[in-house]
Amino acid sequence: MMRTWANINGKLEFIGLCSARGEEWVDGGDGYMYSGNDVAELSCMSYHELRSIAEAEEVDFFPDDSLYGLAVRIAEQRAAKYGRQFFKQEKRSAV
């Protein structure tokens, strides 16, 4: 079980403990896993494509962002602007 946040009315809000089974989750490189329609779609693109999208949609990003980190930044902004599906979970550590 992991703590999970979801986009609710443009805000990322804690929704409880959930299992990630059967869903595609992307490691954002910040200790969290992310999921949602845009996350899945964007994480399949090249870094160059993501940089172009980030610039066009005026998403703040850093030159050293990973491909998945950049995909997450774009998806998170889309969720806030357009109410798109977006989930965030604490990353589980291996025992």
Name each model-derived stretch.
Residues 3-8:
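A short beta-strand micro-motif
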Residues 17-95:
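Basic helix-extension-helix modules of the SAP/HeH family
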